[in-house]
């Protein structure tokens, strides 16, 4: 596969198969039982999903040789950046005076 150096495609495919088996081993819980029982099953399922996600990240990082590098995002020039005041709760051009007390 293009873009990788030193990583065997067979190793990567084997890692992906292992991760797929991990996720398939934890199906979503059924919807039978009381509300509390369903809630507990979903809570335990989410905890197992977090563990599977952590294991999957460790498998991929060991296979690929480290954490992925962040992608550089293209940013606009600073002179084109503006503050949008339409989303503010006050009227444009005025600042909110919350939390400031004026004592004379």
Swiss-Prot record:
Protein localization: Host nucleus, Host nucleolus; Host cytoplasm
Phylogenetic classification of the source organism: Viruses, Riboviria, Pararnavirae, Artverviricota, Revtraviricetes
Protein's UniProt name: Protein Rev
Phosphoserine PTM sites in chain numbering: 5
Domain remarks: The RNA-binding motif binds to the RRE, a 240 bp stem-and-loop structure present in incompletely spliced viral pre-mRNAs. This region also contains the NLS which mediates nuclear localization via KPNB1 binding and, when the N-terminal sequence is present, nucleolar targeting. These overlapping functions prevent Rev bound to RRE from undesirable return to the nucleus. When Rev binds the RRE, the NLS becomes masked while the NES remains accessible. The leucine-rich NES mediates binding to human XPO1.
Record PTM text: Asymmetrically arginine dimethylated at one site by host PRMT6. Methylation impairs the RNA-binding activity and export of viral RNA from the nucleus to the cytoplasm.
Region (Homomultimerization): 18-26
Name of the gene this protein is made from: rev
Cellular component, GO annotation: host cell cytoplasm; host cell nucleolus
InterPro entries: REV_protein (IPR000625)
GO biological process, one term: viral process
Residues spanned by motif Nuclear localization signal and RNA-binding (RRE): 34-50
Motif (Nuclear export signal and binding to XPO1): 73-84
Gene Ontology MF terms: DNA-binding transcription factor activity; RNA binding
Organism the protein comes from: Human immunodeficiency virus type 1 group N (isolate YBF30) (HIV-1)
């Amino acid at each position: 596969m293009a873009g990788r150096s030193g990583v065997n495609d067979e190793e990567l495919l084997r890692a992906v198969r292992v991760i797929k088996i991990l996720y398939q081993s934890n199906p979503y819980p059924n919807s039978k039982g009381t509300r509390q029982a369903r809630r507990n099953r979903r809570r335990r399922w989410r905890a197992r999903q977090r563990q599977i996600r952590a294991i999957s990240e460790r498998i991929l990082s060991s296979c690929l040789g480290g954490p992925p590098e962040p992608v550089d995002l293209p940013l606009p020039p600073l002179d084109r950046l503006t503050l949008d005041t339409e989303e503010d709760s006050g009227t444009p051009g005025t600042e909110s005076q919350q939390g400031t007390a004026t004592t004379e």
